Structures are given as structure tokens and as C-alpha cells.
Amino acid sequence: MKNNYTSLKSPLDEEDELKTDHEIDLEKGPLPEYDSEEEGALPPYSDHALVNNPPNTHRENHSSGTTDNSSPLLIKLLISFTSIILFNAPAVCYLKYKDAFFKNYGAVEWTLFGFWCFVCTLALIFLTYFYETWTKAVKVTVISLAQCVKVTAVFLAKCVKVTAVGLYNSREKWVVIIWLLWVVICYTLFLRAKFGNLNLDKALICSTCSISAALLLFLLYVRLPFWTLKHMFSGLFQVLGVQSCVVIVQKGLMHLFDKHIDGTGYEIEASSLFVIGNFLFFYEMECPGALKRMPKFIRNGIASFLGGIANAIGGANDNNDIPLEETEAESEV
């Protein structure tokens, strides 16, 4: 029997199917070529491919969104406990300093200690429960304090600079006058230390006075270029180096000869080092490079002194080598 099956589709439906087969999906793009020879290869956009690679769900699409920023309970508890420990640390250090930490405790002391532990426990619970609130408050407070300290430091620095510039611009001789007044103040300290009114280490006053004078000059010369300030620091360290060498040589000689300096000797040492240090520093500021040229100057002076002695000795020897006949001829003339 012949199969008399006839399609129920109209010519218009068949034409629509042909158009649909040639249309391109705008979302998926054009269909790539399908190689049927490859094993296991499936045509793209097939139902099997959609099953193996399902589209992203709403949960996956929003996985990179906002997450819960709240800290875990254990971290909150640890930070709150650390803050309470830091708050109690000064009291514990004070009790340890007084040697009264858990020593000779009576009923009253133990009662107070138990009450304080109860208060700390309540504080721990409170801080853990309101963790976000008090941490934000602490951050805001720390930032505000840092800004206040910064503004105060800048204001004080500007005040010091304006004062120093005003003093320097008024008259340069004020630098010398203030430096001399500072020398008088330091000598007053020496006198008070000598008569016992002020207990200071007499052997170290010289360094303190020199550093103080250098800092004073540093403030007065603050408007000068940086190389001048650098030169001031260089001169200060050179002066302190000279003072250290003098002290080392003096102590070494005293130890070598088994001699000891009494109170008057310390005063003489401190006064001499103070005078030498301040003089060298001020001379270095007035004549830059004087300390660097000083070793060469001393070396040339010693060489010329020894050369003069050698010439004198050589001249005496030359006079002794004159023949006797020439001497008699000169005497006759």
C-alpha cells in the first residue's frame, strides 16, 4: 500500500519555518559550524548544552553584592576584653609598684575586688553587644584628637618661627646679646652648683649649656637657608667632638698618674669646657669652616716652629764651621 500521508501545513507555514531557520538569535549570536565527525560534539544551543550549562541564577548574579560586614561574635568579644584589660592596666601597674597587688587583703579589699570584677563583666557584655557603636565612637574620637594635636603643633611652630624671624629682622646684634645673656645664665648655674644650692653634675654642665646655646641660635637663624642650618649642626657636633676629646685625654692622664679630681677640679673642668665649647661654636658660626681648618693651621704652626728651631740650630753650626783665617782677617779689618 502506498502511504498517502499529506502534510497539513499550508505553504505559508512552510515559508515561515524557512525564514525562522535562517534567522539569527540576537542574544546568542550566529551559529558556529557544527562538525559531526567529532565524538561527543553537540550542536551549540542544543537542549543538552543548556542542561549541562544552566543559566546563572539570581543568587549567582548577585553573589558579588553587599555582604554582612558585622564581625563574628568571637572577634567582638576578644576586642572588648582587650579594651577592658588596657583600661585596668594602669591600676595593676600602680599596685605592683606599691607592692600591694593581692597582698594583705582583708574582707573589705576582697569585697571591692569582687565588685570590680562584676563591673568589668557587665562592661564586657555591654561592649560586646554595642560593638559597632562604641568602635565608631572611638575612631571618631581618635581622629579628632589627632587633628587637634596637628593643629596645635602647626600653630606653635608658626609662633616660634614668627618670633625668631622678628628677633632676627629687628637687629642682628640681638643674636649676640641673647647669646651673651645665656652665657651669664649658665655661669649663674655654675655658681649655684658650687655653693650647693643646686645639685648638678658639674662635669656634664658644659655639654648641656652648649646644646642649649646651639638650640637658641638655631631658633634665631631659622629664616636662613638650609645650608646654614646644616652648617650649624655640623659646627655643634664638631664642638662636642672637641669637648669629648679633651675630656678623654684629661681622664686618661688622671687615670695614668692615679690622680683624682675633687669638687673644685670638676668646677674648673666644667667651666673650661663650657667656655671652650661656646667659643668654638660661636667662632664656627661667624667664620664657617674654622674648625676644619684648625688642624691644618695647628699642623702648619708646629711645622714652622720646628723649622725655625732647625734653622736656628743649622745657622749656629754654619757659624762654627767658618775657618779661623777668615775670622782673623775680618777682625783686622
From Swiss-Prot:
Homomer. Interacts with other proteins that exhibit high sequence similarity. It is found in: Spore membrane; Vacuole membrane. It is a multi-pass membrane protein. The chain crosses the membrane at residues 73-95, 108-130, 174-191, 204-226. GO terms for cellular component: cytoplasm; vacuolar membrane. Belongs to the WTF family. InterPro entries: WTF. Signal peptide: none annotated. Residues 19-30 have a biased composition (Basic and acidic residues). Pfam families: WTF (PF03303). The gene is wtf9. Residues 1-69 are annotated as: Disordered. GO terms for biological process: meiotic drive. This is Meiotic drive suppressor wtf9.
